[in-house]
Protein backbone atom coordinates (compact mmCIF):
# COMPACT_ATOMS: atom_id res chain seq x y z
CA UNK A 1 0.00 0.00 0.00
CA UNK A 2 1.48 3.34 -1.01
CA UNK A 3 1.46 6.36 1.26
CA UNK A 4 -1.08 9.08 0.49
CA UNK A 5 0.38 12.49 -0.40
CA UNK A 6 -1.59 14.86 1.85
CA UNK A 7 -1.49 17.61 -0.78
CA UNK A 8 -3.26 15.48 -3.41
CA UNK A 9 -7.02 14.91 -3.72
CA UNK A 10 -8.32 11.80 -2.00
CA UNK A 11 -11.49 10.29 -0.56
CA UNK A 12 -13.49 12.40 1.85
CA UNK A 13 -11.17 15.32 1.93
CA UNK A 14 -12.47 18.65 3.23
CA UNK A 15 -13.13 21.26 0.57
CA UNK A 16 -11.24 24.46 -0.14
CA UNK A 17 -11.84 27.10 2.53
CA UNK A 18 -11.77 30.85 2.08
CA UNK A 19 -10.96 32.49 5.41
CA UNK A 20 -11.15 36.19 6.15
CA UNK A 21 -8.37 37.27 8.50
CA UNK A 22 -9.95 38.70 11.68
CA UNK A 23 -8.73 41.86 13.38
CA UNK A 24 -6.96 39.94 16.15
CA UNK A 25 -4.81 38.07 13.60
CA UNK A 26 -3.55 41.19 11.81
CA UNK A 27 0.25 41.11 11.66
CA UNK A 28 0.49 37.32 12.00
CA UNK A 29 2.76 35.48 9.58
CA UNK A 30 1.00 33.41 6.95
CA UNK A 31 2.71 30.16 8.01
CA UNK A 32 1.65 30.59 11.63
CA UNK A 33 -1.90 31.47 10.57
CA UNK A 34 -2.07 28.28 8.51
CA UNK A 35 -0.75 26.16 11.38
CA UNK A 36 -3.70 27.42 13.41
CA UNK A 37 -6.13 26.50 10.64
CA UNK A 38 -4.63 23.09 9.81
CA UNK A 39 -4.52 21.54 13.27
CA UNK A 40 -1.93 18.77 13.44
CA UNK A 41 -0.30 19.62 10.11
CA UNK A 42 3.51 19.57 10.26
CA UNK A 43 5.23 22.84 9.44
CA UNK A 44 6.96 21.18 6.47
CA UNK A 45 3.54 20.48 4.91
CA UNK A 46 2.45 24.08 5.41
CA UNK A 47 5.59 25.32 3.62
CA UNK A 48 4.97 22.85 0.79
CA UNK A 49 1.41 24.12 0.34
CA UNK A 50 2.61 27.73 0.26
CA UNK A 51 5.51 27.07 -2.13
CA UNK A 52 3.29 25.14 -4.53
CA UNK A 53 0.83 28.02 -4.75
CA UNK A 54 -2.08 26.09 -3.26
CA UNK A 55 -2.35 28.74 -0.56
CA UNK A 56 -3.41 32.14 -1.88
CA UNK A 57 -3.84 35.53 -0.24
CA UNK A 58 -6.33 37.84 -1.93
CA UNK A 59 -6.13 35.61 -5.01
CA UNK A 60 -2.35 35.74 -5.38
CA UNK A 61 0.63 33.65 -4.34
CA UNK A 62 2.32 34.61 -1.10
CA UNK A 63 5.43 33.78 0.89
CA UNK A 64 5.29 31.95 4.22
CA UNK A 65 6.68 34.96 6.09
CA UNK A 66 4.09 37.41 4.71
CA UNK A 67 2.39 39.45 7.44
CA UNK A 68 -1.38 39.24 7.07
CA UNK A 69 -3.73 42.20 7.39
CA UNK A 70 -7.26 42.26 8.78
CA UNK A 71 -9.69 41.52 5.96
CA UNK A 72 -7.23 39.53 3.83
CA UNK A 73 -8.83 36.52 2.12
CA UNK A 74 -6.74 33.37 2.57
CA UNK A 75 -7.39 30.31 0.43
CA UNK A 76 -6.73 27.19 2.51
CA UNK A 77 -6.57 24.10 0.28
CA UNK A 78 -8.12 20.75 1.19
CA UNK A 79 -5.60 18.73 3.16
CA UNK A 80 -5.83 15.06 4.05
CA UNK A 81 -3.77 14.21 7.09
CA UNK A 82 -3.06 10.73 8.42
CA UNK A 83 -6.09 8.59 9.21
CA UNK A 84 -5.05 8.15 12.83
CA UNK A 85 -5.92 11.71 13.76
CA UNK A 86 -3.08 13.44 11.96
CA UNK A 87 0.22 12.42 13.57
CA UNK A 88 1.49 11.16 16.87
CA UNK A 89 2.01 13.85 19.46
CA UNK A 90 5.22 14.62 21.33
CA UNK A 91 6.43 11.86 23.67
CA UNK A 92 4.97 12.11 27.18
CA UNK A 93 8.40 12.34 28.82
CA UNK A 94 9.37 15.24 26.55
CA UNK A 95 6.09 17.03 27.30
CA UNK A 96 6.67 16.67 31.05
CA UNK A 97 10.22 17.95 30.65
CA UNK A 98 9.06 21.13 28.93
CA UNK A 99 6.16 21.64 31.31
CA UNK A 100 8.62 21.55 34.21
CA UNK A 101 10.79 24.09 32.35
CA UNK A 102 8.11 26.82 32.47
CA UNK A 103 9.54 29.50 34.77
CA UNK A 104 6.80 32.16 34.47
CA UNK A 105 3.21 32.39 33.32
CA UNK A 106 0.37 34.88 33.45
CA UNK A 107 -2.74 35.52 31.37
CA UNK A 108 -0.77 36.94 28.43
CA UNK A 109 2.48 35.01 28.13
CA UNK A 110 4.61 32.21 29.43
CA UNK A 111 8.38 31.91 29.69
CA UNK A 112 10.22 28.65 29.16
CA UNK A 113 13.75 27.85 30.30
CA UNK A 114 14.42 26.00 27.05
CA UNK A 115 16.89 23.14 27.36
CA UNK A 116 19.85 22.97 25.00
CA UNK A 117 19.17 20.66 22.07
CA UNK A 118 15.48 21.56 21.84
CA UNK A 119 14.52 23.52 18.73
CA UNK A 120 12.24 26.53 19.13
CA UNK A 121 9.95 25.02 16.49
CA UNK A 122 9.77 21.92 14.34
CA UNK A 123 10.83 21.59 10.71
CA UNK A 124 13.87 20.42 8.73
CA UNK A 125 13.65 16.90 10.12
CA UNK A 126 12.63 18.00 13.63
CA UNK A 127 9.20 16.58 14.48
CA UNK A 128 8.53 18.61 17.61
CA UNK A 129 10.04 21.84 18.81
CA UNK A 130 9.20 23.79 21.94
CA UNK A 131 6.14 25.51 20.49
CA UNK A 132 4.56 22.31 19.11
CA UNK A 133 5.07 20.61 22.46
CA UNK A 134 3.57 23.50 24.41
CA UNK A 135 0.56 23.49 22.09
CA UNK A 136 0.13 19.78 22.78
CA UNK A 137 0.26 20.55 26.51
CA UNK A 138 -2.29 23.37 26.15
CA UNK A 139 -4.67 22.25 23.36
CA UNK A 140 -7.30 24.82 24.30
CA UNK A 141 -4.96 27.80 24.07
CA UNK A 142 -3.57 29.80 21.16
CA UNK A 143 0.19 29.87 21.68
CA UNK A 144 2.65 31.71 19.43
CA UNK A 145 6.43 32.07 19.59
CA UNK A 146 7.47 35.65 20.26
CA UNK A 147 11.09 35.02 19.21
CA UNK A 148 13.50 32.13 18.69
CA UNK A 149 16.59 30.72 20.33
CA UNK A 150 19.21 28.65 18.55
CA UNK A 151 18.64 24.96 19.13
CA UNK A 152 21.87 24.59 21.13
CA UNK A 153 21.30 27.71 23.25
CA UNK A 154 19.44 27.25 26.52
CA UNK A 155 17.40 29.81 28.39
CA UNK A 156 14.41 32.11 28.14
CA UNK A 157 11.97 31.55 25.31
CA UNK A 158 8.82 33.69 25.40
CA UNK A 159 5.47 32.42 24.14
CA UNK A 160 2.44 34.68 23.77
CA UNK A 161 -0.97 33.42 24.89
CA UNK A 162 -2.85 36.36 23.39
CA UNK A 163 -2.61 38.01 20.01
CA UNK A 164 -2.35 41.46 21.59
CA UNK A 165 0.66 40.37 23.65
CA UNK A 166 2.34 38.84 20.60
CA UNK A 167 1.94 42.06 18.60
CA UNK A 168 3.25 44.24 21.42
CA UNK A 169 6.22 42.00 22.20
CA UNK A 170 7.23 41.70 18.55
CA UNK A 171 7.05 45.48 18.22
CA UNK A 172 9.39 45.76 21.22
CA UNK A 173 11.79 43.27 19.62
CA UNK A 174 12.03 45.49 16.55
CA UNK A 175 13.33 48.34 18.72
CA UNK A 176 17.10 47.90 18.63
CA UNK A 177 19.66 49.37 21.04
CA UNK A 178 17.92 47.96 24.11
CA UNK A 179 14.96 50.31 23.79
CA UNK A 180 12.40 47.51 23.66
CA UNK A 181 13.62 44.33 25.34
CA UNK A 182 16.82 44.17 27.38
CA UNK A 183 18.55 40.81 26.90
CA UNK A 184 21.26 39.31 29.08
CA UNK A 185 23.14 36.11 28.31
CA UNK A 186 25.73 34.06 30.21
CA UNK A 187 28.57 32.38 28.36
CA UNK A 188 32.00 30.84 28.75
CA UNK A 189 34.53 32.27 26.31
CA UNK A 190 37.81 30.62 25.35
CA UNK A 191 40.88 32.40 26.74
CA UNK A 192 41.35 35.30 29.13
CA UNK A 193 39.26 38.35 28.25
CA UNK A 194 40.48 41.74 29.53
CA UNK A 195 38.69 43.55 32.36
CA UNK A 196 35.94 46.03 31.66
CA UNK A 197 33.20 46.01 29.07
CA UNK A 198 34.23 45.04 25.56
CA UNK A 199 31.79 46.29 22.94
CA UNK A 200 31.62 44.68 19.53
CA UNK A 201 29.93 46.88 16.93
CA UNK A 202 30.30 44.77 13.80
CA UNK A 203 27.68 44.17 11.08
CA UNK A 204 26.63 40.57 10.49
CA UNK A 205 25.73 38.96 7.20
CA UNK A 206 23.93 35.63 6.87
CA UNK A 207 25.18 33.47 4.01
CA UNK A 208 24.60 29.91 2.87
CA UNK A 209 27.16 27.18 2.53
CA UNK A 210 26.90 24.22 0.19
CA UNK A 211 24.00 22.10 1.34
CA UNK A 212 22.01 25.13 2.48
CA UNK A 213 23.60 25.50 5.94
CA UNK A 214 23.43 29.04 7.30
CA UNK A 215 26.73 30.65 8.18
CA UNK A 216 27.07 34.14 9.66
CA UNK A 217 30.13 36.35 9.39
CA UNK A 218 31.21 39.90 10.09
CA UNK A 219 30.77 41.76 6.83
CA UNK A 220 30.27 45.41 5.92
CA UNK A 221 27.19 44.52 3.84
CA UNK A 222 25.50 42.96 6.88
CA UNK A 223 23.05 44.36 9.41
CA UNK A 224 24.10 46.52 12.34
CA UNK A 225 24.90 44.29 15.32
CA UNK A 226 26.07 45.38 18.78
CA UNK A 227 27.10 43.19 21.73
CA UNK A 228 28.63 44.11 25.10
CA UNK A 229 30.82 41.50 26.85
CA UNK A 230 31.87 41.72 30.51
CA UNK A 231 33.94 39.19 32.46
CA UNK A 232 32.26 37.93 35.64
CA UNK A 233 34.92 35.41 36.59
CA UNK A 234 38.01 33.73 35.15
CA UNK A 235 38.44 30.00 35.52
CA UNK A 236 41.01 27.61 34.11
CA UNK A 237 42.34 30.18 31.67
CA UNK A 238 38.86 30.93 30.31
CA UNK A 239 36.34 33.73 30.90
CA UNK A 240 32.84 33.38 32.33
CA UNK A 241 31.00 36.41 30.96
CA UNK A 242 27.70 38.17 30.74
CA UNK A 243 26.65 39.53 27.37
CA UNK A 244 24.08 42.24 26.76
CA UNK A 245 22.93 42.67 23.19
CA UNK A 246 21.38 45.72 21.58
CA UNK A 247 20.37 43.84 18.43
CA UNK A 248 19.12 40.30 17.92
CA UNK A 249 20.81 38.93 14.82
CA UNK A 250 21.21 35.27 13.92
CA UNK A 251 24.17 33.74 15.85
CA UNK A 252 25.12 37.26 16.99
CA UNK A 253 26.90 36.45 20.26
CA UNK A 254 28.67 33.43 18.79
CA UNK A 255 30.05 35.34 15.80
CA UNK A 256 30.95 38.45 17.81
CA UNK A 257 32.80 36.27 20.33
CA UNK A 258 34.71 34.65 17.47
CA UNK A 259 35.45 38.14 16.12
CA UNK A 260 36.99 39.05 19.50
CA UNK A 261 39.25 36.02 19.30
CA UNK A 262 37.47 34.42 22.28
CA UNK A 263 34.88 32.03 20.80
CA UNK A 264 32.09 30.51 22.87
CA UNK A 265 33.11 27.25 24.54
CA UNK A 266 31.48 24.21 22.99
CA UNK A 267 30.59 26.00 19.75
CA UNK A 268 31.00 23.47 16.95
CA UNK A 269 30.24 26.03 14.22
CA UNK A 270 32.23 29.13 15.17
CA UNK A 271 34.43 27.86 17.99
CA UNK A 272 37.93 26.48 18.47
CA UNK A 273 37.92 22.68 17.95
CA UNK A 274 41.00 22.16 20.14
CA UNK A 275 39.51 24.14 23.04
CA UNK A 276 36.18 22.33 22.67
CA UNK A 277 37.92 18.94 22.76
CA UNK A 278 39.95 19.88 25.83
CA UNK A 279 36.92 21.17 27.74
CA UNK A 280 34.93 18.09 26.79
CA UNK A 281 37.64 15.86 28.22
CA UNK A 282 38.49 17.97 31.28
CA UNK A 283 35.09 19.18 32.53
CA UNK A 284 32.58 17.17 30.50
CA UNK A 285 31.29 20.15 28.50
CA UNK A 286 29.34 18.55 25.65
CA UNK A 287 27.20 21.49 24.54
CA UNK A 288 27.34 25.15 23.59
CA UNK A 289 27.98 27.24 26.71
CA UNK A 290 25.47 29.98 25.95
CA UNK A 291 22.40 30.70 28.08
CA UNK A 292 19.67 33.34 27.73
CA UNK A 293 19.53 34.33 31.39
CA UNK A 294 17.19 37.33 31.62
CA UNK A 295 14.77 39.51 29.70
CA UNK A 296 13.36 42.85 30.81
CA UNK A 297 10.53 44.68 29.06
CA UNK A 298 7.25 46.47 29.73
CA UNK A 299 3.82 45.98 28.19
CA UNK A 300 0.82 48.31 28.11
CA UNK A 301 2.88 51.22 26.79
CA UNK A 302 5.42 50.83 29.58
CA UNK A 303 2.92 50.49 32.43
CA UNK A 304 3.40 46.76 33.17
CA UNK A 305 7.07 45.79 33.71
CA UNK A 306 8.37 42.25 33.39
CA UNK A 307 11.70 40.95 34.68
CA UNK A 308 12.14 37.30 33.68
CA UNK A 309 15.02 35.08 34.74
CA UNK A 310 16.07 31.54 33.87
CA UNK A 311 18.65 29.77 36.06
CA UNK A 312 21.77 28.41 34.40
CA UNK A 313 21.31 24.81 33.26
CA UNK A 314 22.61 22.18 35.69
CA UNK A 315 25.15 20.80 33.22
CA UNK A 316 26.66 24.27 32.80
CA UNK A 317 26.83 24.88 36.55
CA UNK A 318 28.58 21.53 36.97
CA UNK A 319 31.02 22.28 34.14
CA UNK A 320 31.92 25.63 35.75
CA UNK A 321 32.46 23.94 39.11
CA UNK A 322 34.96 21.55 37.51
CA UNK A 323 36.83 24.36 35.77
CA UNK A 324 39.65 25.48 38.08
Where are these regions (language model features)?
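RNA pseudouridine synthases
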Residues: 1-210, 305, 311-323
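Conserved hydrophobic positions within beta-strands
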Residues: 102, 189, 228-231, 264
